[in-house]
Swiss-Prot record:
Pfam families associated with the record: Ribosomal_S20p (PF01649)
InterPro entries linked: Ribosomal_bS20, Ribosomal_bS20_sf
Region Disordered: start-end pairs: 1-25
Classification via Gene3D superfamilies: Ribosomal protein S20
Name this polypeptide is given: Small ribosomal subunit protein bS20
Amino acid sequence: MANTAQARKRARQSVQRNKHNSSLRSMLRTAIKRVRQSIATGDKAAAGETLRKATSVIDSVADKNIIHKNKAARHKSRLAAAVKALA
């Protein structure tokens, strides 16, 4: 239990940050799943469009330090390679 006003405030902030970060991580996972689903259908145009949107989400999450920049680069690289392989 937080004993000081500062500790109570930090506990509140931690809960708020946790909710926000969880939301962003969920958004990231959803974007990646959408790209994989469009790749599975074999539609190169749809896959390219979902990849573009997912890249934006991945970069946004990495900029906010929710995931490491190298993990973001790895996700983007692998998804782009999978979309390119559809050709």
